[in-house]
């Protein structure tokens, strides 16, 4: 009886094994036919960097280079495999934009298991999700093409090297788009003269990194509420800390913004009017800035001037309803206006009735190198404002000027004025921003340009003409624009007024008031930065 059972079991297992083998062969044959059909699209493809996929209904384009291989496309013209670690922003498929970030893993899983129904379902979920890009007007007729990430074995020295981003290019995506562009973007959004308006409200703010500020959603939301409440026409942001776009020498010939090397990466050419997006790390910041400009400041045109690295740099935003007549990124009128300061410290815009200069003036520091750098900048400012005065050009100079003109602009004047490191000349003793040398240069700048410190002017005017008005002296009052970021320690509660609106005397009668937005040792209305916004209101 046991032997019979054993024979039956043996026969059953053998038959089951035979059936499994047949099924397995059918499975492989079926998949080989599918794979072989897909390979037919490559039979007559010529060698070269551009090839044409003639699969089914007209096909779609894809590129091939030494660092990538061909990726098969399904009936929809979409590669089944989406790299989960690749830098994929938007993928344009005619009028549809596919959002891939949240569905990459499930999409890949469906493809690997050859579950066509599941793949179809995922695709239907993806299509229809719309992601705004930095240029709404840009449309592409290409289908979705993705180059799969792969290891690089042989690299041509002439090829661009940019990590996985260079290996995962998306046709019609962010690779060909740049944040910035200045007047080129302004012209695209140009309004008829009769609907254009004048500048009424200007805000200056040292952000101490635009991406860091944005990541704190609660504080950023409060900042945007403030911007919308005052209905700012122009926003001048300093220290945005975004690297400039690096470009090849051939590309630099076609770039409007002149480029040249900085302290780091000497000789590497940059487009200082655009944000870097050529590697994974920079692409993260690029996407944040794109989102800010597209969602929060969609009614504004942006003008960038950036350094080589995440240091310094500026962004000026102007409402599209206001005409910008010209833009300059240096202080020398005899030179090309598109030559930038190599640390992005200067943006000069011309409006109908005045020029607006936004600067992130160099910190004086505590050593001879920094002293010379600040002195050189101040000397350029002396010549610039003198030229503006002689040409009868009204000027509003704003930004983080890194100067406290008087002791009243210091929370602890005695301590600030004694600070030093090592043996330095007497005129450089003191906290950077309040040394005798800096103050002397600042006074000369005001004199040469016939300029006025507008905040101090209006404060003194109130004290002189309004008996009920008393000068604010409390550490918690809104009289300082910079406050020490530390709430404990030797420097806690220290504060200075170093962000300004310096204006031509001819413009004083057009200004309503100057307001320092932040206050308190707890940094109220500083929105995460060590500086607070300052507001200039023009008379309407």
Curated annotation (Swiss-Prot):
UniProt key word Protease: no
Gene Ontology terms: cellular component: mitochondrion; nucleus
Biased composition (Basic and acidic residues): 263-276
Record-level GO BP terms: base-excision repair
Cofactor: Mg(2+); Mn(2+)
Catalytic machinery residues: 531
Cofactor: how bound: Probably binds two magnesium or manganese ions per subunit.
EC number(s) given by UniProt: 3.1.11.2
The UniProt record lists the keyword Metal-binding: yes
Record's comment on post-translational modification: May be proteolytically cleaved.
Reactions mediated catalytically: Exonucleolytic cleavage in the 3'- to 5'-direction to yield nucleoside 5'-phosphates
Keywords from the UniProt entry: DNA damage, DNA repair, Endonuclease, Exonuclease, Hydrolase, Magnesium, Manganese, Metal-binding, Mitochondrion, Nuclease, Transit peptide
Subcellular location: Mitochondrion
Taxonomy, superkingdom: Eukaryota
Consequence of gene loss (knockout): Normal growth of blood-stage parasites. Developmental stages in the mosquito vector are normal with no difference in oocyst numbers and salivary gland sporozoites. C57BL/6 mice infected with knockout sporozoites have a 2-day delay in the appearance of blood-stage infection and have reduced parasitemia. Formation and release of merosomes from infected mouse hepatocytes are normal. However, merosome infectivity towards host erythrocytes is partially impaired resulting in a delay in the appearance of blood stage infection.
InterPro entries membership: AP_endonuc_1 (IPR004808), Endo/exonu/phosph_ase_sf (IPR036691), Endo/exonuclease/phosphatase (IPR005135)
Region (Disordered): 256-276
Residue sites binding Mg(2+) per the record: 206, 239, 400, 402, 530-531
GO molecular function list: DNA-(apurinic or apyrimidinic site) endonuclease activity; double-stranded DNA 3'-5' DNA exonuclease activity; endonuclease activity; metal ion binding; phosphoric diester hydrolase activity
Family: Belongs to the DNA repair enzymes AP/ExoA family.
Role, per record: Multifunctional protein that plays a central role in mitochondrial DNA base excision repair pathway induced by oxidative stress. Has apurinic/apyrimidinic (AP) endonuclease activity towards double-stranded DNA (dsDNA). Has nucleotide incision repair (NIR) activity; acts on dsDNA with oxidized bases thymine glycol and 5,6-dihydro-2'-deoxyuridine. Has 3'-5' exonuclease; can use dsDNA templates with 3'-OH termini including blunt-end, gapped and mismatched 3'-recessed.
Name of the molecule in the record: DNA-(apurinic or apyrimidinic site) endonuclease
Source organism (scientific name): Plasmodium berghei (strain Anka)
Gene symbol of the encoding locus: APE1
